[in-house]
């Protein structure tokens, strides 16, 4: 990790007007700061500041510190109307909030605010959220504190869904033991893709990658059920393991990394496009196969 975090969020302005394509920088940070209950955290802080509390200026170990600025690295971004949601997974100590937002009308380096509010500390670690056609924010909470040499599964991995019109938590669904084939599986649940239209809000499906143990978890909102799918095309390519960076060779074995959907056809079926992170190929499968537990899918390269 570099000394400074720098991430740019880009808005394509030509979507709003008939003009030549031009990319504008919406936000840029060197390091992240937070505002929680009106308190600004822009430097390392041992304790969370609370009204009328008494504090002693004693040093504490990193695993007890409330905020360690250098450790806060953003992972996922999603936009809904004037809000940009930013996730900070707990891969190090000192992460005050894993799900946050800023306003599009903010300055170029706004402070993050916990979503939906400062009481969201029941969320452990989120990567890449998604907003669906029904105005809902979906995410997978891995439940895992992923600090090297201190990995701790604080709670079972779960799907969380928020109503963005009311900012209420609509659903928290814990994944089943059969969805997770080893203790490594929770750390691989880094993305969720929602299959729904504005006319079928109660019949949504979600497709979750598991890059760590190379599978896919499918969730049905109507059935409130989930199931795991295994296939060779979800696995890393053993001929593409080695990456050379700055003259150093790194071996990587991540499997299924992301899933994208086509527009639905006249029957409501989509194509799901996906790939393992370590692979030279892109694959497709129809969502009808994914929605039917136990059915053998036909995957195409």
Residue ranges, per PLM feature:
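Beta-rich, blade/repeat-based domains predominating
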Residues: 67-80, 120-137, 179-206, 236-272, ...
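N-terminal signal peptide
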Residues: 2, 10-34
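Conserved beta-strand positions in repeat-built beta-propeller and related beta-rich domains
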Residues: 86-92, 139-143, 203-212, 270-278
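Surface-exposed loop and turn segments in beta-propeller and other repeat-based domains
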Residues: 30-66, 108-122, 168-187, 226-251, ...
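Short consensus segments that form the blades of beta-propeller domains
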Residues: 89-92, 147-153, 207, 250
């Amino acid at each position: 990790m570099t000394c400074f975090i720098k991430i740019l969020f880009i808005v394509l302005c030509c979507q709003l007007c008939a003009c030549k394509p031009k990319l504008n920088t919406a936000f840029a940070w060197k390091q992240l700061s937070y505002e929680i209950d009106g308190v600004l955290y822009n430097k390392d802080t041992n304790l969370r500041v609370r009204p009328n509390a008494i504090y002693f200026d004693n040093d504490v170990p990193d695993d007890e510190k409330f905020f360690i600025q250098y450790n806060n690295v953003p992972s996922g971004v999603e936009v809904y109307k004037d809000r940009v949601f930013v996730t900070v997974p707990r891969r190090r100590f000192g992460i005050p909030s894993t799900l946050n937002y800023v306003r599009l009308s903010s300055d170029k380096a706004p402070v993050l605010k916990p979503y939906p509010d400062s009481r969201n500390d029941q969320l452990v670690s989120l990567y890449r959220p998604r907003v669906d056609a029904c105005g809902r924010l979906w995410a997978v909470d891995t439940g895992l504190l992923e600090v090297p040499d201190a990995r701790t599964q604080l709670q079972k991995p779960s799907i969380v869904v928020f109503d963005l019109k009311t900012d209420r938590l609509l659903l928290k669904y814990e994944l089943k033991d059969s969805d997770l084939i080893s203790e490594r599986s929770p750390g691989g649940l880094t993305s969720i893709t929602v299959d729904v239209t504005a006319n079928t809000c109660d019949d949504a499906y979600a497709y979750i990658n598991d890059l760590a143990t190379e599978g896919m978890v499918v969730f049905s909102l109507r059935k409130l059920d989930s199931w795991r799918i295994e296939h060779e095309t979800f696995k890393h390519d053993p001929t593409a393991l080695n990456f050379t960076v700055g003259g150093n060779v790194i071996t990587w074995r991540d499997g299924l990394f992301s899933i994208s959907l086509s527009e639905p056809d006249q029957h409501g079926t989509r194509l799901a496009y996906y790939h393992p992170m370590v692979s030279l190929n892109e694959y497709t499968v129809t969502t009808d196969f994914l929605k039917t537990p136990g059915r053998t899918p036909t995957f195409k390269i």
